[in-house]
Amino acid sequence: MLASVPQMDSVRSLPRNHDVVARHASAEDLDAAQQLISSAQAGREHTTDRHRDEKVTAPVRHQMKTSMNGQRWPEQQRTAPPAEKTSTSPKAQKDTSFLGHSCSNCGTKSTPLWRRSPTGAMICNACGLYLKARNVARPTKRNRMEPGSEAGGQQTGHGIAQSESASQGHCQSNSGGGSCPGGGNCNGTGGAEGCDGCPAYNNRVYKSAARGTVPIHSWRATNSGSDRPLAETENDAGKNGATVEGGNMLVSCQNCGTTVTPLWRRDENGHPICNACGLYYKLHGCYRPTTMKKSIIKRRKRVVPALRDQSPSGATYSSNGSSASPEASPAVLAHSHDDHYRYLSSDPTLQANHQRHYAVAPPPVDFTHFSATGSLSLPHHPPPPRLLEPERLSAPSHSPIPQFGRRSISPSTSGSAKKRTLAETTSSTDTASVPTTLESGSNQLPPIISTANPSPPGRLSSISTLLNHSGPHDESRLDPSLAALSRQQQHHKATPLPPHPPSQPLPGVSELESLKEDRRAKLQREAEEMREMLRAKERELAELGA
């Protein structure tokens, strides 16, 4: 009975709440958590969180030791709830802040990707990308704050709520009554239909919202100066370089001093500059002159508002925008084409290039029946008729001239594998009609061209066919429009060539001798007749003189 008493005491000493048992961590879990915390603290520069972690883990270790000893459990059970609350809340905070990481540059505790700076410090993804791209630390809000602003930043919850309400009212007043004309010409004040997506207007709204942490009395002090026009504000900003309102520094361009821009850029020294100055420096390699500064920002009309046709401002600035929108009217596009041609007419060099670019293409050739006819024919250079006659092509070639040409104009219809050129075909047809005495190797030369022995018209006919257009047989293989064009050109010729005599075969040597004898006899007879006529004239003169 006495032996069972300690067992009953140990059973009574167990907690009746099962949730409390589940919340107690084992020694292995505590060691793993301690290793994670120590590894996370290795890259941190701040030592305050390390002391807080030691204070947090000390009650947990003390609770683990006392839970293993059953004698002090009732007292520990009464003091456990406060320790559990203090131990579980930092753990949840550690999980949400990714094991206690914080950016050494901006101080944030949440980021999609943690990075390391060149010095080994832990930085967030935004600061890491900025440092990698510009080799300069990313400017943060705490870097822009003045040293005296830390004391002014410690306000009560009531003061913060009043400043936020004042900043919201200031933003609404700016967005409600703006003087922006719209249509691509923006001054950042809002009030037009397309200002909701304007980067300059959104930038101004963001800047006014960022100054919401200023106390309410500072708004009363600077409220009179905020009603001035935009041009005066930008001029003051250009003179001073930066406008300080209640401890916050308003970003302004280092070059021209403007505070309204669609995109803030940085120069080679890391100073903020506006989009216009940044693009000018990127293109020209020098700073943008301050005389080029304008009070109105002209932006691209990428998104056309739905009520653009009904607004007078959209109709006013639609024609002189910086870029044409896809929904531009045909009249605007026609006007741009007229300007383009007018510009081309002013410069003769560009006009010549433009006309050369839009030159008329040559007429197409119909190759539909090329394989059927076996010859290539163009409208301007038709083949000679001797190449199209099969009896000419089938004649055997006995030309002693070596055949050097390999390119062919018309393939042979006799079915031979070798293709002949124009020179080969002409030489073969000419040598085919030479007498057999020359072929046998005689020493006689071919006859001299004379009136009695005209030249063979074979080559002349081929040249004439090249100069003249082809007949109806060749035109039947071409496109009807091309055939009509060739007939029209043939009709407009001023002096047609005289018709050539039909081709005749060359006479032989014996025939030439007979022709010479006949010619000699004919000339002798004509001479005798002329002598007889001369004697008759002399007799008449003698009779008249007697």
UniProtKB/Swiss-Prot annotation:
Single GO MF annotation? zinc ion binding
Query: Record's superkingdom?
Result: Eukaryota
- State where composition is biased (Polar residues): 65-91, 162-172, 423-453
Q: Which SUPFAM superfamilies match?
A: Glucocorticoid receptor-like (DNA-binding domain)
The biological processes this protein is annotated with in GO are: cellular response to iron ion starvation; intracellular iron ion homeostasis; negative regulation of iron ion transport; negative regulation of transcription by RNA polymerase II; positive regulation of transcription by RNA polymerase II
Where is this chain compositionally biased, Basic and acidic residues type? 16-27, 43-56, 513-531
Biased segments, Pro residues type? 496-505
**GO CC field:** nucleus
Q: Where are the zinc fingers (GATA-type)?
A: 103-127, 253-277
Described purpose of this protein according to its UniProt entry:
GATA-type transcription repressor that regulates iron- acquisition genes through specific binding the GATA sequence element 5'-ATCWGATAA-3' of target promoters. Iron acquisition regulation is critical for survival under both iron-limiting conditions (to acquire essential iron) and iron-replete conditions (to limit iron toxicity). SreA targets include genes encoding a number of key iron-regulated factors such as those involved in siderophore biosynthesis.
List the protein's name: GATA-type transcription factor sreA
What Pfam family is a match, any one?
Answer: GATA
**Comp. bias (Low complexity):** 318-331
Q: What happens when the gene is disrupted?
A: During iron-replete conditions, partially derepresses synthesis of triacetylfusarinine C (TAFC) and uptake of iron resulting in increased cellular accumulation of both iron and ferricrocin (FC). Increases sensitivity to iron and oxidative stress.
- Its main localization is nucleus
Q: Which residues form a coiled coil?
A: 508-546
The domain comment in this protein's record states:
The conserved cystein-rich region (CRR) localized between the zinc fingers is also involved in DNA-binding and transcription repressor activity.
